[in-house]
Amino acid sequence: MTTTLDSLAADIIRIARTDHNVLSMLLCDQTLTLLNGERRNISWLTHEYGQDSLAPIRESFFQERGIDAISPRALKHESLRTARSKARAEVFTPTWVCNMQNNLVDECWLGIPDAFNTTLAREDGVHEWQPTITPVRFPEGKTWKDYVKSKRLEVACGEAPYLVSRYDATTACPIPISHRVGILDRKFRVIDENTPSEPTVANKRLWLRKALQAVQSVYGYDWQGDNVFLSRESILVSFCEYYARRWGRRPKLPTIMKVAEIVAAVL
């Protein structure tokens, strides 16, 4: 499954960066579009790509530079990472820290600790976590549907490691889907645990409806345009990975486009 998901992620990233409709949506600045009455793209707000800081990110950038032209922070040159940290205090959070803080938020919401995983600190200083085996339990007065729709915001989100944890933001090392700890990852787990898995039309529609609600419930903000794009793309890829794990294939293009529309509105 890991190899399949790796292949799927590469396929979705290719679509996100080459398909006109999907890419144009991921680049759309919804705020400026609404204020000005005409379509506007998110701005670079950084000089590292040889573009004017206030210039919009255009589709042609990927056509001219290639689909790998925008890469995660961890894959950027060390000097560039240092410059971004000095200029805008950009510091990304390791996944184990995101997990511990998300665990605290869930403990407050659910009223119980370690609902999704238990954290482990090895003698060598490496931090790990073990996913819980039993389904997540909900307190009286709250249901799994409430959890899926509960709103969460990551401010100065960078590549949104608190929302989705496809990879560790500090190392770019991929994280198996079973060990992901982002807010949206947790919502997808809850959906899988509480909806039927038999691949009927009705069951797929139910899962999709709840999954879209989950995507609609997470918000993020960042100053730099490449971070905004990477965050949007990561949520889109995560959705497709969970869809494929559940139903054995990637979602069709209209569904991918629908998710892109939602993601462009919440980040």
Mark where each language-model region is.
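Conserved S-adenosyl-L-methionine
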Residues: 109-267
